[in-house]
């Protein structure tokens, strides 16, 4: 699952943060940077889910207000061996979704109205399974930590520009401060994006195993990618640091599978799922209970049944 690579990248991000602190204030600056990072992450640990859900205007739904969606999430969570997460809906025309929460016991899955109106039952099952995979892998906490440290690096680098421009034993000087202000956030962004892309591939594979059908997720990714290019997500545009949370990059400026992309290219993700489907003969045994005969995805598929 690429956990070793993720750990190395996270360690590099922390080291970069301490390095910026060292350039500003020497050994004491590095120590202070570490303390600030710990305090910031502690705050994010307890509050990040509420903050991001509020940012996107998500409202919680229950079996009474969204019975089909709630039942689908409950069944997939059971198949994944997870506690039932809270379910939220965002009033946004762009089809997309994300998961948040500090652990599986305090997790939430949020989907847009555009997603519920655009996907078939099977495709929506694939998307929900992908988000549950992030919860199962504790990616929601990991991405909160990386986003928090990356943001702190940017703020610290700007602080160094104004207060680290002297030429004493500790200050990097004006040129060094300028370089730090530009390169440190850039380096943090590269590490953050590399971690995000690593976790997306892992969540795709686990999500396919949870729902049992890799091609459900592959079909959903293709449909969401096509629509996301045409329908802007204004909340995400105002808060681009949250783009990595979504199943498909919600921002208007997208790249290929390279250092500057928040996600792997959708084409590569679909190809990986197609290979997984080919290896398994089209279906996978997730290891959970068999599907409920009354499950939405055992009925005839139709467009947009969740609106």
Curated annotation (Swiss-Prot):
It is found in: Cell inner membrane. InterPro entries: HtpX_protease (IPR050083), Pept_M48_protease_HtpX (IPR022919), Peptidase_M48 (IPR001915). The keyword Nucleus does not apply. CDD domains: M48B_HtpX_like. One of its GO terms (molecular function) is zinc ion binding. It is a multi-pass membrane protein. Keywords: Cell inner membrane, Cell membrane, Hydrolase, Membrane, Metal-binding, Metalloprotease, Protease, Transmembrane, Transmembrane helix, Zinc. The keyword Zinc-finger does not apply. Its EC number is 3.4.24.-. Zn(2+) binds at residues 130, 134, 200. Residues 277-307 are annotated as: Disordered. The active site is at residue 131. Pfam families: Peptidase_M48. The chain crosses the membrane at residues 7-27, 28-48, 145-165, 171-191. Binds 1 zinc ion per subunit. Belongs to the peptidase M48B family. PANTHER family: PROTEASE HTPX. This is Protease HtpX homolog. The gene is htpX.
């Amino acid at each position: 699952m690429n956990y070793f690579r993720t750990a190395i990248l996270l360690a590099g991000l922390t080291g970069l943060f301490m390095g910026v602190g060292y350039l500003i204030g020497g050994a004491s600056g590095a120590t202070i940077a570490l303390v600030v990072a710990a305090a910031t992450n502690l705050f994010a640990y307890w509050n990040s889910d509420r903050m991001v859900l509020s940012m996107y205007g998500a409202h919680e739904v229950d079996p009474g207000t969204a019975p089909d969606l709630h039942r689908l999430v409950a069944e997939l969570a059971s198949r994944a061996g997870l506690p039932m997460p809270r379910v939220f809906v965002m009033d946004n025309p762009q089809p997309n979704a994300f998961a948040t929460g500090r652990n599986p016991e305090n997790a939430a899955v949020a989907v847009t109205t555009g997603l519920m109106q655009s996907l078939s039952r099977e495709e929506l099952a694939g998307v929900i399974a992908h988000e549950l995979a992030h919860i199962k892998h504790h990616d929601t906490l990991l991405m909160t930590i990386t986003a928090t440290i990356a943001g702190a690096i940017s703020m610290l680098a700007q602080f160094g520009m104004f207060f680290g421009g002297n030429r004493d034993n500790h200050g990097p000087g004006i040129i060094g401060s300028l370089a730090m202000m530009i390169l440190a956030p850039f380096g943090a962004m590269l590490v953050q994006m590399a971690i995000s892309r690593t976790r997306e591939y892992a969540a795709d594979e686990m999500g396919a195993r949870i729902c049992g059908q890799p091609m459900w997720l592959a079909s959903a990714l293709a449909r969401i990618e096509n629509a996301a290019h045409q329908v802007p997500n204004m909340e995400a545009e105002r808060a681009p640091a949250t783009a990595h949370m979504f199943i498909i990059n919600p921002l208007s400026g997208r790249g290929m599978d390279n250092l500057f992309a928040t996600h792997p290219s959708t084409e590569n993700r679909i190809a990986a799922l197609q290979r997984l489907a080919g290896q398994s003969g089209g279906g996978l045994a997730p290891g959970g209970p068999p599907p409920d005969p009354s499950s939405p995805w055992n009925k005839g598929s139709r467009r947009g049944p969740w609106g």
